[in-house]
Amino acid sequence: MDFSRPHLTDDDRAFLDEVRTFLATHVTEDVKRRDRETGDNFDEGVHLALGAAGYLEAEWKTEADGGFPRVRRRIWELEKRRAHVPWVTWGTTAMVARSVASFGSPELRDEVLPGVFSGHVRLCLGYTEPEGGSDVATCKTRAVRDGSTWIINGSKMFTTGAHNCQYVFLITNTDPEARKHKSLTMFLVPLNSPGIEIQGLRTVDGDRTNIVYYSDVRVDDRYRLGEVNGGWTVLREPLNVEHGAVDANPDGLQDVSIMMHQANFMAVAVDKAAAIAGRSGSVADRSVAYRLGRAAARVEASLSAPSIFGRVALAQAMRDVSPDLMDLLGSASALPIGTEGAVDDGAADYVFRFAPLVGIYGGTLEVFRNMIAQYVLGLGKPNYSPPVVKTS
């Protein structure tokens, strides 16, 4: 395995300087503060600036279609993360836009994709239902055909970014009598349609997500993606991307795991805890040194786990490491970012509050472990039926 640094040409270095200057200009401390206060993980001014500068289109497109070359793509990804660009809404937008490009009509592609590249059109995910849990195929939101339109009724949970988006990538049930994977149809529903109500929810880590209600929402058939009852085919690729079940590129110029953005918060928290222990002298206590070393080792190991394995390893490490850091640092570590007296400027507190959610986003840890067991280890499906009680 080659661990040498990739060679940067003069043009690559100029691009690095350009990106750093651009991000420093637009991702200001005020932007970061506002993002913490709203929990949106989105800033419209920054997003539109990224679109106007051509960065969104270059990130979305392949190199063959005019996107970033591999080295510059990696530079862009790393610098965007270092600058703490509010990114979640662009993540869902880029993911859904690929389904629009693959399954949408030419008219729909022309309506949506130019705005995606300029930043004026954002797309969110309408997957989870209040009673659906992690199994998105158990969809109860109904779409009933009425001539050239569809009437949609139902509700979705955790539609993050809906209040900042123009369309939702919506799973609907169009044949309740069919098997669940044969009953789904996907739509790209305009969020300004009559009958849509968006209600905000704040999660324990401070992020905002949404419940979205659909009451007799009429959607033209041109907003359908793929075949009627063929939604699982449309949905499979974005689900694989969200799960991290994608093949790695052989050049190594990419994140090892899909959860790297979140993992960096954990790495920073461990570094800060170790620095505080070093300054206070508590690291001389062998139990403290051991726990810090264990935390660092867990972080390092999880950062090196690829694909869907990394998603599980990072989420579990965050759940295990964060309470240990809080215990080592004491009560002042419970103060959030920007609070006077926070021992580590809120790093451990944020990871502690974020950790439970990492094991839920995009599917639970149990779902991912089952996927690894079935598709990697070749084991059978788990049996959740109650044990048979033998009677004499």
What do the PLM-derived regions correspond to, one by one?
Residues G119-Y127:
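A short, Trp-centered hydrophobic/proline-enriched beta-strand micro-motif
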Residues S4-L8, E197-S302, V358, T391-S392:
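Glycine-rich beta->alpha junctions and the first turn(s) of the following alpha-helix
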Residues G51-G119, T160-Y167, V299, L303-G310, ...:
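Internal helix-loop-helix
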Residues V31-T38, S282, R286-A289, G293-V343:
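C-terminal helix-coil-helix/basic helical segment that borders enzyme active sites and/or dimer interfaces
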